[in-house]
Amino acid sequence: MTHSLPKLDYANEALAPIMSAETLDLHHGKHHQTYITNLNNFIKDTNMANMSLEEIISESSKDKSKAGIFNNASQHWNHNLFWKCMKPNGGGQMPSKLEKLSLIHI
């Protein structure tokens, strides 16, 4: 299984002004892609080549000699979650109770 960069559910400029199109493109298209490229290179011709991302993370976490695999697989998973959590126009209004608590601690 070759791991690949996920398609975003929004355009590169959709997160501006919080994240510019240039920043998003660099982070998604270059930074995240590097983790995927490294991961695919690490697992090529190994027993992990046909595993899901979660299986690779689980298996590589058990062996210190597979730290490179673990790091790149974990960063790929983290970035997948990051992109899913982002959305145009933010997440809307923070619930008032949470907003009050956050203001107390800032």
Residue locations for each model-derived region?
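Acidic, low-complexity proline/glycine-rich segments
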Residues: 1-11
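Conserved alpha-helical segments that form or flank metal/cofactor-binding pockets of metalloenzymes
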Residues: 36-50, 61-98
